[in-house]
A protein has these predicted regions:
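Extracellular attachment/recognition segments
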Residues: 2-167
């Protein structure tokens, strides 16, 4: 069964057959010299379906949205960064079963400078897994940019994440 969402006080409430869960946007505060850049998920839309999954899993959350990022390469430069953000409803470790995700570049700016002029933008990897500190699914997206005679800035990605859970 699919659900509808309604906004109440900055939160989105999912109405389904037998539960109400608040879903809100949040970011991860990673600290230290090797911290990955973090961002907030924006425009998140969630569909919850009742399923008969493995090992008692009975819910499938499908989440789509965008995340603003800023990764840039100039002239003869290569840059790779891994961005992280949280998606979906709060879940305990016992409720969470598995998550998968995909991502694509949604917005980029290219400024042509000198010959030869070429650039490459890639999504190298997408990982989605439960984060025990935040009790939500953390998505990690590795983005690569190569510039040759251009300045390339990636400013937004779109994502889709599926979460299998037991409610």
């Amino acid at each position: 069964m699919l659900t509808r969402s309604k906004k109440y006080g900055g939160r989105i409430w999912l109405n389904d057959i037998d539960s109400r869960m608040a879903v809100h946007q949040a970011s991860i505060n990673l600290q230290g010299p090797a911290a990955m850049p973090t961002t907030d998920a924006i425009g998140e839309q969630v569909i919850e379906a009742v399923v008969a999954g493995p090992d008692g899993a009975n819910r499938l959350f499908t989440i789509i949205g965008a995340a603003n990022v800023c990764i840039e390469a100039t002239r003869q430069q290569r840059t790779t960064e891994t961005w992280t953000f949280l998606v979906g409803p709060p879940l305990t470790r016992l409720q969470f079963h598995r998550a998968i995700g995909t991502a694509s570049i949604a917005s980029q700016i290219v400024s042509v400078q000198t010959a030869p002029r070429e650039f490459t933008v890639n999504i190298h990897s997408v990982e989605a897994d439960w984060d025990d500190e935040n009790q939500r699914v953390k998505v990690r997206v590795e983005i690569g940019v190569i510039a040759n005679g251009t300045t390339v800035t990636v400013t937004q990605i779109r994502y889709s994440v599926a979460i299998l859970a037991q409610m």
